[in-house]
């Protein structure tokens, strides 16, 4: 069975891999070269730097980050060593849109009739804000 090392601070992972992989949950500081040496995959956040210092000599062939960005992952190293990397773009967009609307409601509590909402950018967050405005 494959072995997955998972950063313990990632919410909602729970038993998602039960029956298909052996999982080890570690805090960011516990994800060391020794801890990942016999792992097939890593699931991390930005606190764990995934580079040669961590991955050299390991079996890791898949790194998933539960974040939008990949600044903490040496993509060149991973590419050169056959390690697939995936991230989670847009994963926090609904929460950011909620924050936007909470801010708007805090600043503008009275009548909304006749007002125009301006949204700069219609990426993940802007699209959600616009969709909720239409409802």
Name every feature range the model reports, one short phrase each.
Residues 8-10, 27-30, 45-49, 68-70, ...:
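Short beta->alpha connector loops
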Residues 13-20, 33-36, 53-57, 73-80, ...:
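Short loop/helix-cap segments at secondary-structure boundaries that form the rim of catalytic
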Residues 1-39:
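N-terminal glycine-/charge-rich "phosphate-binding" loop or analogous flexible N-terminal tail
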């Amino acid at each position: 069975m494959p072995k997955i090392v998972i950063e313990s601070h990632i919410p909602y992972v729970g038993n998602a891999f039960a029956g298909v992989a052996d999982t080890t949950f570690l805090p960011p500081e516990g994800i060391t070269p020794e801890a990942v040496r016999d792992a097939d995959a890593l699931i991390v956040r930005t606190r764990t730097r995934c580079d040669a210092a961590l991955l050299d000599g390991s079996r890791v062939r898949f790194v998933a980050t539960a974040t939008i960005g990949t600044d903490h992952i040496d993509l060149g190293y991973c590419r050169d060593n056959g390690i697939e990397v995936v991230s989670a773009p847009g994963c926090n967009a609904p929460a950011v849109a909620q924050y936007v609307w909470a801010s708007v409601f805090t600043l503008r509590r009275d009548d909304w009739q006749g007002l125009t909402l301006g949204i700069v950018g219609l990426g993940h967050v802007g699209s959600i804000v616009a969709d909720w405005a239409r409802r």
